[in-house]
Amino acid sequence: MVKAVAVLSNSNEVSGTINFSQEGNGPTTVTGTLAGLKPGLHGFHIHALGDTTNGCISTGPHFNPNGKEHGAPEDETRHAGDLGNINVGDDGTVSFTITDNHIPLTGTNSIIGRAVVVHADPDDLGKGGHELSKTTGNAGGRVACGIIGLQG
């Protein structure tokens, strides 16, 4: 079993921890708990770079090793890092579990060293008709991020 973790934070009181685990070549399970977010849906993605030198903006675009358009997690055409939305409760907190086959912790397309990003707005899953729908899901600014690090 390979395990990884990302600790999310920013200057706006958003905080939390996201854990990743993968058994063999199976899917990766993502579990997380976050606090300090506005209630409602927030886009949730793996971004290409593990660089936070300029805050979350330095994490680059969505992780997309296959050069596809943005989509929903269940779509065949999607970025590898497209994990859809998390639904934050009225108290500003969310706990979630996601299982995904496109974000391995080992191999050529490993997400280790990349970043996980929570966005300000809902991800339209590439179906919103906005000019940004097919690249970012029109999910708005980046409100929190963390670098995905390997755990022992």
Swiss-Prot record:
Instruction: Provide the cofactor list for this protein.
Output: Cu cation; Zn(2+)
Disulfide pattern: C56-C145
Residues involved in Cu cation binding: H45, H47, H62, H119
Keywords tagged on the record: Antioxidant, Copper, Cytoplasm, Disulfide bond, Metal-binding, Oxidoreductase, Zinc
Reaction(s) catalyzed by this protein? 2 superoxide + 2 H(+) = H2O2 + O2
Q: How does it assemble?
A: Homodimer.
Q: Where does Zn(2+) bind?
A: H62, H70, H79, D82
- Keyword Disulfide bond assigned to the entry: answer is yes
Q: Name one GO molecular function term.
A: superoxide dismutase activity
Q: What is the protein's name according to its record?
A: Superoxide dismutase [Cu-Zn]
Please verify whether the record's keywords include Metal-binding. Answer: yes
UniProt xrefs under PANTHER family: SUPEROXIDE DISMUTASE CU-ZN -RELATED
* Cofactor binding, note field: Binds 1 copper ion per subunit. Binds 1 zinc ion per subunit.
Q: What protein family does this chain belong to?
A: Belongs to the Cu-Zn superoxide dismutase family.
Tell me, in a sentence or two, what this protein's role is: Destroys radicals which are normally produced within the cells and which are toxic to biological systems.
UniProt-listed InterPro entries: SOD-like_Cu/Zn_dom_sf, SOD_Cu/Zn_/chaperone, SOD_Cu/Zn_BS, SOD_Cu_Zn_dom
| Known EC number | 1.15.1.1
Q: What is the annotated localization of this protein?
A: Cytoplasm
